[in-house]
A protein has these predicted regions:
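Bacterial Sec-dependent N-terminal signal peptides
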Residues: 1-10
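Bacterial N-terminal signal peptides
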Residues: 12-20
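C-terminal motif of bacterial Sec signal peptides marking the signal peptidase cleavage site
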Residues: 22-24
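Bacterial signal peptide processing site
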Residues: 26-28
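Short, well-ordered beta-strand elements
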Residues: 32-41, 92-96, 119-122, 168-169, ...
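N-terminal lobe/hinge region of extracytoplasmic solute-binding protein
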Residues: 38-88, 212
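Aromatic- and charge-enriched surface segment that lines or borders ligand/interaction sites
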Residues: 82-133
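Gly/Pro-rich hinge or "lid" segments in bacterial periplasmic/extracellular proteins
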Residues: 166, 172-232
């Protein structure tokens, strides 16, 4: 995310036909100043780690990036990850993070680098708070089901590790050739521990100041049932 650009994205809370919606989506270009997108209802929360509603995910994925994302054709491409390897047995996925990935505040100020530990923090928080999206990964990540069900209280036994600041590793309970697709789910997105702790229960409330941003946009303002404005 670069603070120098002043591009805005406005979401108008009105109902249009599918044709108009697709037209609006197709007209967004790098040179456009305003992008209108139709949404059915206000997000009740932007806590991307706990919520599993489309109203949350559709907004949050414009603000926060994960390891992988979909391109315009639906292919999985790197986002915060710049490269990854898979072990021969298909159980261990190791991701190298981009060194230029940063967290920014709602004011556009640099807060901290995005690190591998942010992914560990995110999954632990999701497990501790019983995220609505746990079903997506509970049986996938080694040891996660035991942690969620209280068979262990030691999160270090769960198959997500920060090998170093730029390397995060997932160990799976069984091979999943489609694992990379799951990294686009917001439950596997990172979160900065210091910011999360400072926010407490306010983290992810629908207010620009209650999130950190590492994605394409910063939430500039929100008016219920009217406008959500993004700044790039």
């Amino acid at each position: 995310m670069k603070k120098s650009k002043a591009k805005y994205l406005t979401l108008a809370g009105v109902v249009l036909s599918a044709g108009l919606l697709l037209g609006a989506c197709g007209n967004s270009t790098s040179s456009s100043k305003v992008y209108n997108y139709v949404y059915a209802s206000d997000p009740s929360s932007l806590n991307y780690l706990l919520e599993n509603r489309a109203t949350t995910g559709d907004v949050a994925t414009n603000l926060v990036d994960g390891l992988m994302e979909n391109d315009q054709y639906g292919n999985y491409i790197p986002s915060l990850a710049e490269d990854w390897t898979v072990s021969k047995d298909g159980l261990t996925y190791t991701y190298k993070l981009r060194k230029d990935a940063k967290w920014y505040t709602a004011d556009g100020e640099e807060y901290a680098p995005v690190t591998a530990q942010d992914f560990v923090t995110g999954l632990k928080y999701a497990a501790d708070k019983k995220s609505e999206a746990l079903y997506l990964v509970q049986d996938s990540v080694a040891g996660l089901d035991d942690y969620i069900n209280g068979k262990t209280t030691d999160f270090s036994t769960v198959g997500v590790k920060a090998i170093d600041d730029q390397t995060v590793q997932y160990t799976l309970a069984k091979p999943e050739p489609y694992w990379n697709s799951k990294t686009t789910a917001t439950i596997l997105f990172p979160v900065n521990a210091d910011f999360l702790n400072s926010q407490g229960d306010d983290f992810g409330k629908v207010d620009p100041a209650n999130l950190l941003y590492n994605g394409p946009f910063i939430l500039k303002s929100f008016t219920s049932k009217s406008v959500m404005e993004y700044k790039k």
